Structure formats: C-alpha cells, structure tokens
Amino acid sequence: MLLGRSAAELESWAVAQGQKPFRGRQLHDWLYAKGARSLSEITVLPKAWRESLKEDGVEVGRLKEVHRSVAADATTKLLLSTDDGETIETVGIPTDQRLTVCVSSQVGCPMACRFCATGKGGLQRSLRTHEIVDQVLSVREVMDRRPSHIVFMGMGEPLLNSQAVLDAIRCLNDDLGIGQRRITVSTVGVPKTLPQLAELALATLGRAQFTLAVSLHAPNQALREELIPTAHAYPYEALLEDCRHYLAVTGRRVSFEYILLGGLNDAPEHAAELADRVGGFQSHVNLIAYNPIEEEEFQRPTRARIEGFQRVLERRGVAVSLRASRGLDQNAACGQLRRRRQGS
C-alpha cells in the first residue's frame, strides 16, 4: 500500500521502480493533498508506469464507505470497509473552530468494557497504518474540511497496536500537517505498555508530544474491575505509577478519562475518592457523560449529578473539564453503527 509512506519513502520507492525522485513527490502530493483513491486518478504519472503498478498489485490503500450517519449537530459517523471485508467506524466532530476526527485502531476490541458497544463483539484484528490514516482522509473528503485534531478513541485498544498507531501519527504529523499536540491517544490500560509506549514514541517520532489519555472510569480497583474485566491484571496503583513514569520520560501531562454512569460511579464520594487518587498528579480529568447503547443496563447521569461530580473535583484542586456530548440522535457512541449493521 502507498498510503502511510512518507515523502522520502515514496521518493526512494519511485527510484527503485526506475523513476525519477520527483515522481515520488508527485505521488505524495496526490495521496495526501489531493486524496487520490486509485492510481488511475494520478494522471501526472506516466500511464505505462501506472499500468505496470496495477499489474504488480500496487494499490493506494483507501477504504470504501459503507454507510454514513449525520446527526443534527453535523457530527458525521462513517462505516468503512477494509480490503478483507471487515468494517470500522470513524467520526468527524465539527465545531466552528475545529474538526476533530475520532479514529479506530483495531477491528473490534479485546478489552470488553461493559459499557462499550465495540467490546461486545471481541477483537478481529489490528488495523494497519494506511487503514488508520485513511479514516482521517475519508472524513476530510466527506465533510470537505481539513481536520485539526485527532483522537484515538474509536474502536480498539491503541496500545495493543502501538507501532501502527505511532506510524500513523508520524504520517498525520509530517504528511498531513496535523501537530502532535493536537493528537490524543487513549488507552484503558494494558500492563507494561505505557513504559514501552514512551520509549517507542521517542524512537518512532523523535519526540512524544501527543496527549496520552488513560481511561480510569472508576476511583478504585474494585469498581474498575466491575466495569473493565481486564483491569484485574493491572492494579490501580501500578497504572498510576506507569503514568508517572510516562510523564517523567516525555514531559507530557496525562489526561484521565472518566465516564459517568448514572447511579454507579457518579456520586460525590466517588469524586472525592478520585481526587485523592489523582490529586497532586500533573494531569487533567476529562469527564464523559455516558452515551447509552442499545440493549444495555447503564444510564446517563442527570445534569445535577454531572455538575456535582465536577464541583467536587474542582474544590479539591483537580483540573477537570466535561466533554460535550455529540451525535446523540445518531448513536455516535463507538461501535454502535457497526454493531447495528452487523445485526441487520
């Protein structure tokens, strides 16, 4: 696949194909600036070379749109098909100032979080670099707007596909011009992966300036294991210690994600316990009101409970914000569209 390769890699590849280096630069322009979907579109390349590449099975690496869902607030969810017939979701979330793309890193997810639609179907496979990059290009194409921010908060556990994720970040940064500080990688926590991520990011990117978001979703180990079955293998304090190590190695503060589930983890005492855990930590807590999924027992908390939880954290000196809910009328929570289409 050509998508995902850097300008230098495309130049070297073109030379190896018997072409001049500038042919690689032309390819780069058509892949990333123009968003070409096939070699036949790249008419600046010699026709004979294009035909030869097709015969050799060389492809651009774009995915096919299977379904599109647009909410009243213009949040746009795409269901994309890979070349082996799997489907993944990506979401474009627009505001006046920015366009955030929520990308998937795997087909399905092995973490089985009880409140997540994606985890219901398990893991099929990890995505390749070009499949991650394509999601951003697809949203740009459909919404006719340049993405400004990227969040790895779609289907899958990014840290179980670290190299492809980091390679995609390099591409998004260098080839699409999206700054690392505008990219967030979210993880529910997998033992040993946080220290590895810090080292791998430095090796792959030369620096680690993207934001790491760790999904806590509970203020203690017992409740976390109830919500996230895999958490039993990763004690709460060990997870926080690995976050401190990541901060020390990269110099980047950690963001903690906390999904508020009505009547389960949204009480003032939960907020106080969470503040005790992360207080004094160079971090930020991002609260997320639960987005209901079909056939699930969890409830979205009331506005009063959400605001009360946030006030407790603020009074304890914890940096906190509440993520705006988007696309509620179109079931924009991760995995819902794919799950619905598979069941139909």
Curated annotation (Swiss-Prot):
Swiss-Prot/TrEMBL keywords: 4Fe-4S, Cytoplasm, Disulfide bond, Iron, Iron-sulfur, Metal-binding, Methyltransferase, rRNA processing, S-adenosyl-L-methionine, Transferase, tRNA processing
Record-annotated disulphide pairs: 102-334
Keyword rRNA processing: yes
Cofactors required: [4Fe-4S] cluster
Catalysed transformations (reactions): adenosine(2503) in 23S rRNA + 2 reduced [2Fe-2S]-[ferredoxin] + 2 S-adenosyl-L-methionine = 2-methyladenosine(2503) in 23S rRNA + 5'-deoxyadenosine + L-methionine + 2 oxidized [2Fe-2S]-[ferredoxin] + S-adenosyl-L-homocysteine; adenosine(37) in tRNA + 2 reduced [2Fe-2S]-[ferredoxin] + 2 S-adenosyl-L-methionine = 2-methyladenosine(37) in tRNA + 5'-deoxyadenosine + L-methionine + 2 oxidized [2Fe-2S]-[ferredoxin] + S-adenosyl-L-homocysteine
GO term, biological process aspect, one: tRNA methylation
Annotated catalytic residues: 89 (proton acceptor), 334 (s-methylcysteine intermediate)
EC class name: transferase
Gene Ontology MF annotations: 4 iron, 4 sulfur cluster binding; metal ion binding; rRNA (adenine(2503)-C2-)-methyltransferase activity; rRNA binding; tRNA (adenine(37)-C2)-methyltransferase activity; tRNA binding
Radical SAM core domain ranges (all copies): 95-329
Pfam family, one: RlmN_N
Subcellular location per the Swiss-Prot or TrEMBL entry: Cytoplasm
Binding site for [4Fe-4S] cluster: 109, 113, 116
UniProt-annotated binding residues for S-adenosyl-L-methionine: 156-157, 186, 215-217, 291
A GO CC term assigned to this protein in UniProt: cytoplasm
EC numbers: 2.1.1.192
Recorded superkingdom: Bacteria
PANTHER family (UniProt xref): 23S RRNA METHYLTRANSFERASE, RADICAL SAM CORE DOMAIN-CONTAINING PROTEIN
NCBIfam families: rRNA_mod_RlmN
Family in the record: Belongs to the radical SAM superfamily. RlmN family.
Further comment found in the protein's record: Reaction proceeds by a ping-pong mechanism involving intermediate methylation of a conserved cysteine residue.
Name under which the protein is recorded: Probable dual-specificity RNA methyltransferase RlmN
Organism from which the protein derives: Parasynechococcus marenigrum (strain WH8102)
